[in-house]
Design a protein with these regions (language model features):
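Non-heme Fe(II) oxygenase metal-center motifs and adjacent flexible, charged/small-residue loops
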Residues: 1-224
Length: 224
């Protein structure tokens, strides 16, 4: 747990463990990631809206490495079509480590970071994400979040409940957001997508793609 504690207070006032780096991805990088998304969304496990307590989410999700469904990770998408999700690519590990380095983590923390799953969410203009914690992972390693397309209002809260104190910030196309250490279990959500705010050349004309990299802490003998 202590390995991934970040003690610096970032200048944006989000508190220890959280960092927002605007325009971290270039337009070329964003466009390339959108091209990858077009491949991922087709399958072998196609993009879908997960159901939480019987209610379908407004965002649609496709996964790499491990398949996420509430409230577990499996290799096979037993809630979709029973197929195994694509492997987690090596370039995403390198991307995640570069994100941590740029967010202020130490060299030791960066080298120990080995994400093994990506949750890729697509938000249409009316989609939302309620306040929640990312706590289905065994590992306490940081979450790396990338935004592409339309900007959104991202609400980043506290670790105790969904209420105040929280901070609303705008995540634009190309932005990086990292949260770990004391902020790892902070409640967070998306209250609004801002239509027609995607920059020309990012590869996405409408909606928002959010890619989150995580370390599950899972092994194959602990999965379906």
């Amino acid at each position: 747990l202590t390995l991934f504690t970040l003690d610096i207070d970032p200048p944006d006032g989000l508190g220890p463990g959280a960092a927002h780096l605007p325009a971290w991805l270039s337009l070329d990088q964003q466009r390339w990631l959108v091209e990858q998304f077009r491949v991922w969304e087709r399958g072998p496990v196609p993009i879908r809206a997960a159901k939480v307590r019987g209610h379908e989410m407004s965002v649609r999700t496709v996964c790499l490495g491990w398949h996420w469904q509430p409230y577990q990770y499996t290799r096979r998408a037993t809630d979709v079509n029973g197929e195994e999700v694509p492997p987690f690519p090596d370039w995403m590990v390198r991307l995640g480590r570069r994100a941590l380095a740029d967010a202020g983590y130490t060299a030791e923390q960066v080298s120990a970071y080995t994400p093994d799953t990506a949750l890729v969410n697509f938000y249409h203009r009316d989609a939302r994400m309620g306040m929640h914690q990312d706590k289905d992972e065994i590992s306490s390693a940081p979450v790396v979040s990338l935004s592409i397309g339309d900007a959104c209002t991202f609400r980043f809260g506290n670790v105790e409940n969904r209420s105040r104190p929280y901070t609303d910030l705008r995540l634009a196309s190309g932005d990086l957001f990292v949260f770990g250490g004391p902020a790892r279990l902070a409640f967070h959500g998306v209250t609004r997508v801002h239509p027609s705010t995607a920059p020309d050349g990012c590869g996405l004309d409408d909606g928002r793609i959010n890619i989150t990299l995580r370390m599950t802490g899972m092994t194959d003998d602990r999965s379906d």
